[in-house]
């Protein structure tokens, strides 16, 4: 979701917001580099405005749609960055900190939070790129930021697909779930998801580079000749393998789960277990639905742009920015969903934000027990010393 996909024929103009020259079509990115891939988008402030039927209104002075869009995007990116980093790191902390949170489902949630935290950490770089109209951070960071975008997109959807299959096994095959749904297996599957995402992320990292154009620097993707073929091939492969196929698998899994939940009143023989099973299934479904809602517009937009030519208007530019920002917004929504939909997460978040005396005592006792396990010889020595002191006091005590 980087902001560098731009037409090569654009020149500089006076940017009403940054008071400096602005280079071509920098979509403030999301699908990274779907803004990179979608190189036909032009900056409404660029010289291409003369190609829009003379409608110079795309680059008016202060108060223009471009300035309003820029301010809105910067404000949204700031909120997403702060909420996303804090929320996702908090999710990872409570999963690592509390033993009761180390379930198979939460291990997958940890992976999702890690991917979201990584992508929100790139937003400051993309904001600077958008405001300055150039990429000042060098080629290495260009490669890192673009590849993180693709890694986040693919790892997130693969993890959600895994969570849906995991829920399907838990609901429809509870006996098999006992052997399969373990934290250890969940960790292995998480690693496999990152390896699978590398099929997209690593090629993108190698293709990402910086280019000098019209006095500015673009962080963009380069394709072998013929570039249009490889560019469209990447778009289509990402759309099919990192969106359509996972969404189909998720849909099938939840369709089968709904049929199972409707046909069976008692899944596990325990009302409490059934309640927890349905609650977790509902939470995963909501997280998946929100992801699809946030990411569908940008995927559809990019595919449409690959197939047909869309006239460049203010509405087209604003809608592009909106689709990109919507994809990023998903990265900060998941922690909020966990807090509202899962009692365990809600309780852990509350304990972290508002620690009570009982929680502090419990943490201290847990730490003492951990130290005792880590240093048994020291603990035994202390016990023996205390026992000897008690005996000495008993022996030296005056008789009544």
Swiss-Prot record:
> What are the BP-aspect GO terms?
adenylate cyclase-inhibiting G protein-coupled acetylcholine receptor signaling pathway; adenylate cyclase-inhibiting G protein-coupled receptor signaling pathway; G protein-coupled opioid receptor signaling pathway; negative regulation of cytosolic calcium ion concentration; negative regulation of nitric oxide biosynthetic process; negative regulation of Wnt protein secretion; neuropeptide signaling pathway; phospholipase C-activating G protein-coupled receptor signaling pathway
Lipid (S-palmitoyl cysteine) attached at which positions? 353
Q: Which residues cross the membrane?
A: 69-93, 107-131, 143-165, 186-207, 231-255, 284-306, 315-338
Q: Which residues are recorded as modified (Phosphothreonine)?
A: 372, 396
Q: Which residues lie on this side of the membrane: Cytoplasmic?
A: 94-106, 166-185, 256-283, 339-400
**How does the entry describe its membrane topology?**
Multi-pass membrane protein
| Annotated compartments | Cell membrane; Cell projection, Axon; Perikaryon; Cell projection, Dendrite
User: Which PROSITE patterns does the annotation name?
Assistant: G_PROTEIN_RECEP_F1_1, G_PROTEIN_RECEP_F1_2
- Residue ranges for motif NPxxY? 334-338
Give this protein's Gene Ontology molecular function annotations: beta-endorphin receptor activity; G protein-coupled receptor activity; G-protein alpha-subunit binding; G-protein beta-subunit binding; morphine receptor activity; neuropeptide binding; voltage-gated calcium channel activity
Q: Kindly give the SUPFAM superfamilies that the UniProt entry links to this protein.
A: Family A G protein-coupled receptor-like
Gene3D superfamilies listed in its UniProt record? Rhodopsin 7-helix transmembrane proteins (1.20.1070.10)
Give Gene Ontology CC terms.
Answer: axon; dendrite; endosome; neuron projection; perikaryon; plasma membrane; synapse
Modifications made to the protein after synthesis: Phosphorylated. Differentially phosphorylated in basal and agonist-induced conditions. Agonist-mediated phosphorylation modulates receptor internalization. Phosphorylated by GRK2 in a agonist-dependent manner. Phosphorylation at Tyr-168 requires receptor activation, is dependent on non-receptor protein tyrosine kinase Src and results in a decrease in agonist efficacy by reducing G-protein coupling efficiency. Phosphorylated on tyrosine residues; the phosphorylation is involved in agonist-induced G-protein-independent receptor down-regulation. Ubiquitinated. A basal ubiquitination seems not to be related to degradation. Ubiquitination is increased upon formation of OPRM1:OPRD1 oligomers leading to proteasomal degradation; the ubiquitination is diminished by RTP4.
Alphabetized CDD domains for the sequence: 7tmA_Mu_opioid_R (cd15090)
Disulfide linkages recorded for this protein, renumbered to the chain, are 142-219
List the stretches on the Extracellular face of the membrane. Answer: 1-68, 132-142, 208-230, 307-314
Q: How does it assemble?
A: Forms homooligomers and heterooligomers with other GPCRs, such as OPRD1, OPRK1, OPRL1, NPFFR2, ADRA2A, SSTR2, CNR1 and CCR5 (probably in dimeric forms). Interacts with heterotrimeric G proteins; interaction with a heterotrimeric complex containing GNAI1, GNB1 and GNG2 stabilizes the active conformation of the receptor and increases its affinity for endomorphin-2, the synthetic opioid peptide DAMGO and for morphinan agonists. Interacts with PPL; the interaction disrupts agonist-mediated G-protein activation. Interacts (via C-terminus) with DNAJB4 (via C-terminus).
Family membership = Belongs to the G-protein coupled receptor 1 family.
PANTHER family in UniProt? MU-TYPE OPIOID RECEPTOR (PTHR24229:SF7), NEUROPEPTIDES RECEPTOR (PTHR24229)
Q: What is this protein called?
A: Mu-type opioid receptor
**Which species expresses this protein natively?**
Macaca mulatta (Rhesus macaque)
Q: What is the lineage of its organism?
A: Eukaryota, Metazoa, Chordata, Craniata, Vertebrata
């Amino acid at each position: 979701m980087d902001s560098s996909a731009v037409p090569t024929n654009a020149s500089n103009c006076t940017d009403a917001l940054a008071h400096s020259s602005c280079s071509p079509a920098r979509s403030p990115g999301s699908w990274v580099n779907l803004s990179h891939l979608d190189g036909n988008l032009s900056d409404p402030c660029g010289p291409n405005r003369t190609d829009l039927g003379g409608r110079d209104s795309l680059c008016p002075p202060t108060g223009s749609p471009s300035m309003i869009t820029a301010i809105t995007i910067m404000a949204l990116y700031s909120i997403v960055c702060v909420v996303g980093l804090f929320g996702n790191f908090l999710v990872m902390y409570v999963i690592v900190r509390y033993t009761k949170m180390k379930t198979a489902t939460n291990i997958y949630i940890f992976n999702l939070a890690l991917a979201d935290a990584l992508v929100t950490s790139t937003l400051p770089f993309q904001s600077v790129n958008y405001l300055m109209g150039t990429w000042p951070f060098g080629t290495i960071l260009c490669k890192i930021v673009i590849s993180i975008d693709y890694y986040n997109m693919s790892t997130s959807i693969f993890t959600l697909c895994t969570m849906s299959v995991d829920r399907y096994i838990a609901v429809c095959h509870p006996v098999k779930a006992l052997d399969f749904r373990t934290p250890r297996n969940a960790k292995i599957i998480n690693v496999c998801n990152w390896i699978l995402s590398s099929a997209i992320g690593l090629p993108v990292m190698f293709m990402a580079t910086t280019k000098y154009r019209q006095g500015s620097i673009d962080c963009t993707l380069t394709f072998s000749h013929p570039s249009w073929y490889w560019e469209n091939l990447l778009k289509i492969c990402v759309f099919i393998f990192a969106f359509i196929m996972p969404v189909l698998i998720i849909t099938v899994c939840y369709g089968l789960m709904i049929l199972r939940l409707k046909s069976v009143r008692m899944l596990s023989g325990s009302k409490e277990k059934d309640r927890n099973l349905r609650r977790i299934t509902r939470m995963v479904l909501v997280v998946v639905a929100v992801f699809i809602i946030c990411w569908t517009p940008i995927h559809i937009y990019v595919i449409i742009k690959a197939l047909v030519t869309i006239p460049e208007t203010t509405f087209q530019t604003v809608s592009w920015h909106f689709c990109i920002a919507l994809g990023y917004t998903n990265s900060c929504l998941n922690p909020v969903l966990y807090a509202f939909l899962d009692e365990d997460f809600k309780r852990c978040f509350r304990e972290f934000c508002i620690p009570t005396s009982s929680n502090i005592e419990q943490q201290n006792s847990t730490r003492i027990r951990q130290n005792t396990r880590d240093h048994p010889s020291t603990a035994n020595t202390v016990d023996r010393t205390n026992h000897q002191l008690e005996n000495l006091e008993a022996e030296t005590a005056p008789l009544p």
